[in-house]
């Protein structure tokens, strides 16, 4: 199996595109971030569950986010086993000042390429998340492994930057107006997604009942990255569109629906426009993000406890009912 990438030129613009055995594929996947921000020992069972659930959701690509850390060999062995392509970023996030000890950084790049280059799942190198590359990084990577594609960061060479990160009216995904940065349902997007409320059981693991309901904004925002995803405001307003809730049980149930509708809409839009089928040319979507590093009020298709949310069910149902039956 030969895996590569190229710039696909179409009447509707140009786009980065994964190629397998010379044929373009639609990259459907998510962004893998640290499994546990508390830095407790990583569990092979947890890693396997996360990657097997990715395949259950019909993903074919996993992006190793440059703002995290390098997974161990077991992660890449599993990607080989499960047929997941790996978009591999190196250890830089948005710091354009670069490390003080650049020689040490390049030594780390060299050891990483040597460790990973024999994995068939490894599809693509990206020097950083959202930063310029350290001088010499590209030449070193290409010298050590000239069989894979390369780009400087996740937002260049026909690849869009991320957004919207917040919940919006689902129709905005269809209308391509969900992001304040402009059109995002075009080409290849490695970082597009929206949060969903975790299960009620996980919410009760996050905070005391007195802060859970009525919603204590200060506490909820603390468990939402300082309110980054607007779970206590915008998300709450979207939930209230289905009627004011009288309990956390009622709010959590409606909150699952809000998250599911957004995830369903996002995947429907990209699926409709994949490759040359729709109104716009889309070659890939990697959902931000794949896994929760801590217990928090902003989950994705599953929460920190690995409990599937309604977003996962609707993603699976978009392609086949069989996968949803397995959950």
Model-derived features: positions:
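Substrate-binding clefts and catalytic carboxylate motifs of secreted carbohydrate-active enzymes
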Residues: 176-321
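Active-site-adjacent substrate/metal-binding segments within catalytic domains
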Residues: 5-6, 10-124, 226-260
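Beta-sheet entry/capping signal
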Residues: 60-61, 83-85, 123-124, 147-149, ...
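Single conserved hydrophobic/aromatic residue that forms the stacking wall/gate
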Residues: 1-9, 319-327
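Alpha-helical structural signal in soluble globular domains
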Residues: 74, 78-84, 115, 136-144, ...
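Generic beta-strand/beta-sheet core signal
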Residues: 28, 64-65, 87-89, 128, ...
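Active-site region of glycoside hydrolase catalytic domains
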Residues: 113-217
């Amino acid at each position: 199996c030969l895996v590569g990438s190229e710039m696909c030129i179409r009447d509707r613009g140009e786009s980065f595109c994964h190629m397998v055995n010379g044929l373009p594929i639609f990259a459907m996947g998510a962004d893998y971030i640290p499994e546990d921000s508390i830095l407790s020992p990583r569990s092979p069972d947890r890693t396997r569950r996360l990657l097997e659930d990715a395949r259950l959701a019909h993903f074919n690509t996993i992006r190793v986010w440059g703002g995290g850390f390098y997974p161990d060999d077991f992660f890449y062995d599993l990607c080989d086993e499960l047929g997941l392509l790996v978009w591999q970023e190196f250890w830089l996030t948005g710091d354009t000042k670069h490390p003080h000890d650049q020689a040490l950084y390049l030594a780390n790049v060299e050891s990483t390429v040597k460790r990973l280059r024999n994995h068939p799942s490894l599809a693509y190198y990206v020097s950083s998340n959202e930063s310029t590359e350290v001088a010499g990084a590209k030449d070193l990577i290409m010298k050590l492994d000239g069989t894979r594609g390369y780009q400087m960061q996740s937002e260049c060479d026909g690849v869009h930057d991320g957004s919207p990160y917040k919940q919006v009216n689902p129709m905005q995904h269809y209308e391509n107006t969900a992001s304040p940065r402009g059109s995002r349902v075009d080409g290849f997007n490695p970082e597009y997604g929206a949060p969903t409320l975790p299960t009620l059981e996980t919410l009760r693991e996050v905070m005391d009942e007195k802060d859970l309901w009525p919603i204590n904004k200060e506490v909820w925002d603390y468990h939402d990255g300082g309110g980054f995803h607007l779970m206590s405001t915008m998300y709450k307003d979207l939930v209230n569109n289905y009627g004011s809730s009288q309990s956390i049980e009622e709010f959590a149930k409606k909150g699952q629906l809000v998250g599911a509708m957004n995830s369903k809409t996002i995947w429907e839009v990209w699926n409709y426009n994949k490759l040359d089928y729709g109104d716009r040319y889309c070659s890939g979507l990697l959902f931000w993000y794949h896994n929760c590093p801590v217990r928090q009020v902003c989950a994705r298709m599953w929460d920190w406890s690995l409990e599937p949310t309604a977003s996962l069910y609707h993603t699976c149902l978009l392609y086949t009912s069989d996968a949803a039956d397995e959950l």
